[in-house]
């Protein structure tokens, strides 16, 4: 059977997204072109921007790094990409995957920065799970990871991170929020670019519309070097329930993944229109043009350094709406469980060393 796109080469695979029989060169082309179109249509980058790639060593981040390097050279984005990895401290998983990232650093000729939970917080994920058990450990990891990425970006002087979240991840998040009745989060979870007042860093997802199966095929046919083991603690996550449901639906209807994403986007748009009110006129505020700082998705950062310390955590100096940021709140709970452990001579309490470490790394905004 011939490829339906070029009609000259033998079809080597059936594309998961469309079920079209295509050859490998055409598959590479459509896969990369769709990602390029996502980047261009959303104005994700600007020439001279320095952008961090969230690198875990897994298939998604490895394909992301490979494609970003390829497209950057092909279309002359003029972007300086660097790799940023987080070491959560999960033995047998993260230590091995970081070795893959180190090889990717050489393969793609990119700088690499690794930020460790143990250095930032005084806790590894293995220690956290040993303390709290298997439930809710993803909550701790999510909060700590987000702040670790911000601090790593600040160290690199970067305000824009691209992550390997794919279409399957997006659909799972939409479904999770619906199953939990958390429709308020649909707005954020369907956006290609996200940011918040609690973070100085913009995050974008160039692989938003790329199917996981196609990412795996791309990595396989391109013979990319990636780590394929799943996180030790992820089977306990609620996301697994949504993933199983979506995989079952996808087997019947391949377009299910994109359909769910578009449904989430449409739901958000409808909510926004209803909030505006019938007959109301929405006037966009005029934004004063200023030089865009390093990184930022071509959009000035949403925070203002003139806000001062009132918007910073009183313990570690991290941006926060509350007096104490989420990471420090979680750390206080963890350190309370260490009451019977020997207190280090130079620390007033079990949390002091961790807080001092975070204070030294307070973001300069």
Curated annotation (Swiss-Prot):
One of its GO terms (cellular component) is cytosol. Keywords: Cytoplasm, RNA-binding, Transferase, tRNA processing, tRNA-binding. Its EC number is 2.7.7.-. GO terms for molecular function: nucleotidyltransferase activity; tRNA binding; tRNA-uridine 2-sulfurtransferase activity. InterPro entries: CTU1-like_ATP-bd (IPR056369), CTU1_C (IPR032442), Ncs6/Tuc1/Ctu1 (IPR000541), Rossmann-like_a/b/a_fold (IPR014729), TilS/TtcA_N (IPR011063), tRNA_thiolation_TtcA_Ctu1 (IPR035107), UPF0021_CS (IPR020554). Belongs to the TtcA family. CTU1/NCS6/ATPBD3 subfamily. This is Cytoplasmic tRNA 2-thiolation protein 1. It comes from Yarrowia lipolytica (strain CLIB 122 / E 150) (Yeast).
